[in-house]
Amino acid sequence: MWLRLLFICSLACSIAFAQSVPIDPALSKITIHVDKTGLFSFAGDKHEIAAPIASGTVDEKAGAVEFTIDARKLKVLDPQLDEKKRAEVQKTMHSPSVLDSTQYPEIKFHSTKATPAGSNAWNVTGNLTLHGQTHPVSVAVKKEARSGKAAYIVSTKLKQTDFGITPVAVAGGTVKVKDELKLDFEVVTR
Protein backbone atom coordinates (compact mmCIF):
# COMPACT_ATOMS: atom_id res chain seq x y z
CA MET A 1 0.00 0.00 0.00
CA TRP A 2 2.74 2.48 0.99
CA LEU A 3 4.72 1.56 -2.08
CA ARG A 4 1.73 2.25 -4.31
CA LEU A 5 1.09 5.60 -2.56
CA LEU A 6 4.77 6.55 -2.94
CA PHE A 7 4.63 5.67 -6.64
CA ILE A 8 1.47 7.76 -7.18
CA CYS A 9 3.00 10.74 -5.31
CA SER A 10 6.23 10.57 -7.30
CA LEU A 11 4.28 10.31 -10.56
CA ALA A 12 2.13 13.32 -9.63
CA CYS A 13 5.23 15.35 -8.72
CA SER A 14 6.97 14.51 -11.98
CA ILE A 15 3.89 15.58 -13.94
CA ALA A 16 3.60 18.81 -11.93
CA PHE A 17 7.23 19.73 -12.63
CA ALA A 18 7.19 18.71 -16.29
CA GLN A 19 6.62 22.00 -18.09
CA SER A 20 7.84 21.11 -21.56
CA VAL A 21 4.81 20.96 -23.84
CA PRO A 22 4.96 19.49 -27.36
CA ILE A 23 4.16 21.64 -30.37
CA ASP A 24 1.09 20.67 -32.38
CA PRO A 25 2.37 20.18 -35.97
CA ALA A 26 -1.17 20.29 -37.37
CA LEU A 27 -1.62 23.88 -36.14
CA SER A 28 1.94 25.25 -36.11
CA LYS A 29 3.50 26.79 -39.20
CA ILE A 30 5.97 29.20 -40.72
CA THR A 31 4.93 31.66 -43.42
CA ILE A 32 7.61 33.45 -45.42
CA HIS A 33 6.85 36.64 -47.34
CA VAL A 34 9.20 37.24 -50.25
CA ASP A 35 9.31 40.68 -51.87
CA LYS A 36 10.90 41.89 -55.10
CA THR A 37 13.32 44.64 -56.05
CA GLY A 38 15.22 45.90 -59.08
CA LEU A 39 14.66 48.33 -61.92
CA PHE A 40 11.87 46.21 -63.44
CA SER A 41 10.51 44.82 -60.17
CA PHE A 42 6.99 45.73 -61.34
CA ALA A 43 7.32 42.77 -63.72
CA GLY A 44 8.17 40.33 -60.90
CA ASP A 45 6.02 38.59 -58.32
CA LYS A 46 5.84 38.67 -54.56
CA HIS A 47 5.69 35.21 -53.03
CA GLU A 48 4.13 33.63 -49.98
CA ILE A 49 5.65 30.35 -48.83
CA ALA A 50 4.54 28.16 -45.93
CA ALA A 51 5.36 24.91 -44.15
CA PRO A 52 4.19 23.16 -41.01
CA ILE A 53 6.47 23.10 -38.00
CA ALA A 54 7.29 19.39 -37.85
CA SER A 55 8.20 19.01 -34.19
CA GLY A 56 9.36 20.81 -31.09
CA THR A 57 8.57 21.82 -27.53
CA VAL A 58 7.81 24.94 -25.50
CA ASP A 59 8.71 25.32 -21.83
CA GLU A 60 7.27 28.67 -20.82
CA LYS A 61 8.57 28.57 -17.23
CA ALA A 62 12.12 27.87 -18.37
CA GLY A 63 11.78 30.31 -21.26
CA ALA A 64 12.76 27.60 -23.71
CA VAL A 65 11.52 26.71 -27.16
CA GLU A 66 12.91 24.47 -29.86
CA PHE A 67 11.44 23.37 -33.14
CA THR A 68 12.26 21.82 -36.50
CA ILE A 69 10.80 22.54 -39.92
CA ASP A 70 11.21 20.15 -42.84
CA ALA A 71 12.57 22.53 -45.52
CA ARG A 72 11.43 20.08 -48.21
CA LYS A 73 7.82 20.79 -47.18
CA LEU A 74 8.04 24.52 -47.87
CA LYS A 75 5.32 25.22 -50.41
CA VAL A 76 4.71 28.24 -52.63
CA LEU A 77 1.14 29.42 -51.99
CA ASP A 78 0.88 32.36 -54.44
CA PRO A 79 -2.79 32.28 -55.47
CA GLN A 80 -2.14 34.91 -58.17
CA LEU A 81 0.13 32.51 -60.09
CA ASP A 82 -1.07 29.67 -62.27
CA GLU A 83 -0.08 26.13 -61.29
CA LYS A 84 2.78 25.95 -63.83
CA LYS A 85 4.40 29.19 -62.60
CA ARG A 86 3.93 28.14 -58.94
CA ALA A 87 5.67 24.83 -59.68
CA GLU A 88 8.53 26.72 -61.37
CA VAL A 89 9.00 29.00 -58.34
CA GLN A 90 8.81 25.96 -56.03
CA LYS A 91 11.48 24.09 -58.02
CA THR A 92 13.79 27.13 -57.99
CA MET A 93 13.27 27.62 -54.24
CA HIS A 94 14.28 24.02 -53.42
CA SER A 95 17.15 23.94 -55.94
CA PRO A 96 20.86 23.89 -54.98
CA SER A 97 21.12 27.56 -56.00
CA VAL A 98 18.65 28.67 -53.29
CA LEU A 99 17.60 26.50 -50.29
CA ASP A 100 19.21 23.26 -51.44
CA SER A 101 16.60 21.46 -49.36
CA THR A 102 17.92 18.04 -50.38
CA GLN A 103 21.29 18.75 -48.76
CA TYR A 104 19.86 20.92 -45.94
CA PRO A 105 16.47 19.34 -45.17
CA GLU A 106 15.97 20.92 -41.74
CA ILE A 107 15.42 24.43 -40.45
CA LYS A 108 15.92 24.49 -36.68
CA PHE A 109 15.51 26.97 -33.85
CA HIS A 110 16.74 26.49 -30.28
CA SER A 111 16.30 29.28 -27.74
CA THR A 112 19.17 30.32 -25.47
CA LYS A 113 17.47 33.09 -23.47
CA ALA A 114 13.99 34.50 -22.88
CA THR A 115 13.23 37.76 -21.11
CA PRO A 116 9.68 38.79 -20.12
CA ALA A 117 8.45 41.78 -22.15
CA GLY A 118 5.02 42.40 -20.64
CA SER A 119 1.92 40.31 -20.18
CA ASN A 120 2.17 37.15 -22.30
CA ALA A 121 5.18 38.52 -24.18
CA TRP A 122 8.90 37.71 -24.27
CA ASN A 123 12.05 38.70 -26.08
CA VAL A 124 13.63 35.42 -27.11
CA THR A 125 17.20 34.91 -28.32
CA GLY A 126 18.33 31.67 -29.87
CA ASN A 127 20.14 29.95 -32.69
CA LEU A 128 18.52 29.52 -36.09
CA THR A 129 19.93 26.92 -38.46
CA LEU A 130 19.04 27.46 -42.11
CA HIS A 131 20.83 26.28 -45.24
CA GLY A 132 23.42 24.51 -43.06
CA GLN A 133 24.42 27.70 -41.24
CA THR A 134 23.60 28.60 -37.64
CA HIS A 135 23.31 32.21 -36.51
CA PRO A 136 21.91 33.92 -33.40
CA VAL A 137 18.55 35.66 -33.79
CA SER A 138 16.38 37.69 -31.43
CA VAL A 139 12.60 37.81 -31.76
CA ALA A 140 9.61 39.26 -29.93
CA VAL A 141 7.08 36.58 -28.95
CA LYS A 142 3.43 37.12 -28.02
CA LYS A 143 1.17 34.46 -26.55
CA GLU A 144 -2.49 34.12 -27.54
CA ALA A 145 -5.18 31.65 -26.50
CA ARG A 146 -6.68 29.66 -29.39
CA SER A 147 -9.40 27.11 -28.70
CA GLY A 148 -7.95 26.30 -25.30
CA LYS A 149 -4.39 26.01 -26.62
CA ALA A 150 -1.42 28.34 -26.30
CA ALA A 151 -0.27 29.98 -29.54
CA TYR A 152 3.08 31.77 -29.62
CA ILE A 153 3.25 34.33 -32.42
CA VAL A 154 6.47 35.70 -33.92
CA SER A 155 7.02 38.09 -36.80
CA THR A 156 10.62 38.82 -37.74
CA LYS A 157 12.91 39.56 -40.66
CA LEU A 158 16.14 37.98 -41.81
CA LYS A 159 18.54 38.33 -44.69
CA GLN A 160 19.09 35.36 -46.98
CA THR A 161 22.74 36.29 -47.47
CA ASP A 162 23.35 35.91 -43.70
CA PHE A 163 22.68 32.19 -44.23
CA GLY A 164 24.69 31.78 -47.44
CA ILE A 165 21.71 32.08 -49.79
CA THR A 166 22.03 34.28 -52.86
CA PRO A 167 18.68 35.94 -53.67
CA VAL A 168 17.30 34.91 -57.06
CA ALA A 169 17.85 37.46 -59.85
CA VAL A 170 16.67 37.38 -63.46
CA ALA A 171 17.07 39.60 -66.52
CA GLY A 172 20.55 40.68 -65.52
CA GLY A 173 19.41 41.60 -62.01
CA THR A 174 16.72 44.02 -63.17
CA VAL A 175 14.19 41.81 -61.35
CA LYS A 176 15.27 40.07 -58.19
CA VAL A 177 14.13 38.73 -54.86
CA LYS A 178 14.82 41.08 -51.95
CA ASP A 179 17.53 39.85 -49.61
CA GLU A 180 15.34 40.56 -46.58
CA LEU A 181 12.48 38.12 -45.94
CA LYS A 182 9.59 38.52 -43.50
CA LEU A 183 8.88 35.41 -41.44
CA ASP A 184 5.75 34.73 -39.41
CA PHE A 185 5.74 31.82 -36.99
CA GLU A 186 2.68 30.37 -35.29
CA VAL A 187 3.75 27.87 -32.66
CA VAL A 188 0.72 26.16 -31.11
CA THR A 189 1.10 23.68 -28.25
CA ARG A 190 -0.96 20.53 -27.78
Walk through the language-model features, giving the residues of each.
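Bacterial N-terminal signal peptides
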Residues: R4-A16
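Low-complexity, acidic/polar, glycine-enriched regions of mature
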Residues: A18-R190
